[in-house]
């Protein structure tokens, strides 16, 4: 009888431990060079013209990926696509990954894996991987849309949408969903969204656009 109890306890440990090691959650932000909170008429007019560039960032509050703890660390993906992001692409997107400079070698590899898992094909063609200090702060403003990101040559600063002041056509909604998987986020205004690096041979600087998302991510 004692033998069967021991086996049962061993089996219970085996099935519980991986579940605890696999969870990861944190904060998420993205900004694009087109409005994501917009009306269909404006979105249709911008398709294939704007929205080909974006900055995405994940900051881990707690958890592990591939059995590597990532608490407090962040990773950023800077994306340049051939077509408006959120639409079918005619060619592969290019990306630059910026990894938290505090990460160890194992954590660096796990953070790169996190970005690739969450962004999928958007980071399928990585042209550069850089280490940098990453500052990612989400403030406690009324509607939760205020955040700031600085990572190398990439910067995002957002504010909450004002349902009255920020309307143009009157039937705005979150026309384009977030680019990352496993996120809960709300649209926000990008006060500033810029990338001044050299990896793409192109830079961008955008401001006061309804083109951001601020929220959280969770992988179970």
What kind of feature is each model-predicted range?
Residues 1-4:
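Positively charged n-region of N-terminal signal peptides that target proteins for export
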Residues 22-99:
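N-terminal Sec/ER secretory leader and immediately downstream segment
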Residues 98-217:
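Mature, soluble, non-transmembrane domains
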């Amino acid at each position: 009888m004692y033998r069967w109890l021991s086996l049962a306890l061993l089996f219970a440990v085996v099935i519980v431990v991986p579940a605890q090691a696999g969870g990861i959650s944190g904060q998420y932000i993205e900004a694009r060079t087109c409005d994501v909170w917009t009306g269909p008429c404006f979105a249709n007019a911008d398709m294939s013209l704007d929205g080909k560039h974006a900055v995405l960032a994940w900051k881990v509050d707690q958890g592990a990926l591939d059995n590597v703890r990532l608490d407090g660390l962040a990773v950023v993906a800077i994306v340049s696509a051939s077509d408006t992001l959120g639409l079918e692409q005619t060619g592969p997107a290019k990306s630059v990954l910026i990894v938290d400079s505090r990460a160890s070698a194992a954590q660096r590899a796990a953070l790169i894996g996190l970005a690739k898992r969450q962004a999928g094909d958007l980071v399928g063609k990585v042209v550069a991987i850089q280490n940098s200090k990453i500052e990612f702060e989400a403030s406690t403003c009324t509607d939760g849309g205020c955040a700031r990101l600085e990572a190398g040559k990439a910067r995002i600063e957002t504010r909450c949408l004002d349902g009255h002041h920020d309307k143009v056509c009157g039937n705005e909604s979150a026309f384009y969903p977030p680019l990352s998987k496993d996120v809960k986020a709300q649209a926000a205004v990008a006060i500033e969204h810029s990338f001044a690096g050299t990896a793409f041979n192109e830079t961008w600087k955008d401001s006061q656009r309804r083109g951001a998302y601020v929220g959280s991510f969770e992988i179970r």
